[in-house]
């Protein structure tokens, strides 16, 4: 693989400085972290399934997943405080760029009828979140090893507080956004 971090340092930073008209290189937007999270939903009661979900995310990310717990009890959802409700992984630096490259080059092209990811996932503060419906698009996941099919949320946190700059950064890094109609 070419190395997305090297690509960012060599080419993307120069294009960003030119297109966004930023003179100070320290003010250029950069990717700070990627958070991969899964909510277990109805499967939260079964600890074996929770462990399987955490193991699957660990395989995908290349880093150990943390099982998230409920902060407070919600009777309507039959959730108690401290009960396992999902799993997440926070990726930074080398693992973050490796995951992003794998996502762009290998995983997203494996999505059936893929036409690009939505441009509507920006939160107004320069962060971008999108969802994946199935974990089987990742090459590390073996179909026979999963107990339940689940999707995941992927959040990309950037150093900028501007959605326009964050979009330009992610677009130059190669994220395949859907065409505007």
UniProtKB/Swiss-Prot annotation:
GO cellular component: ribonucleoprotein complex; ribosome
Keyword rRNA-binding: yes
Record-level Gene Ontology MF annotations: rRNA binding; structural constituent of ribosome; tRNA binding
InterPro entries the record matches: Ribosomal_uL5, Ribosomal_uL5_bac-type, Ribosomal_uL5_C, Ribosomal_uL5_CS, Ribosomal_uL5_dom_sf, Ribosomal_uL5_N
Record key words, sorted: Ribonucleoprotein, Ribosomal protein, RNA-binding, rRNA-binding, tRNA-binding
Gene Ontology BP, a term: translation
Segments passing through the bilayer: none
Its job: This is one of the proteins that bind and probably mediate the attachment of the 5S RNA into the large ribosomal subunit, where it forms part of the central protuberance. In the 70S ribosome it contacts protein S13 of the 30S subunit (bridge B1b), connecting the 2 subunits; this bridge is implicated in subunit movement. Contacts the P site tRNA; the 5S rRNA and some of its associated proteins might help stabilize positioning of ribosome-bound tRNAs.
Binding partners and assembly: Part of the 50S ribosomal subunit; part of the 5S rRNA/L5/L18/L25 subcomplex. Contacts the 5S rRNA and the P site tRNA. Forms a bridge to the 30S subunit in the 70S ribosome.
NCBIfam families for the chain: PRK00010.1
UniProt xrefs under PANTHER family: 60S RIBOSOMAL PROTEIN L11-RELATED
Family indicated by similarity: Belongs to the universal ribosomal protein uL5 family.
Protein name: Large ribosomal subunit protein uL5
Taxon lineage: Bacteria, Pseudomonadati, Campylobacterota, Epsilonproteobacteria, Campylobacterales
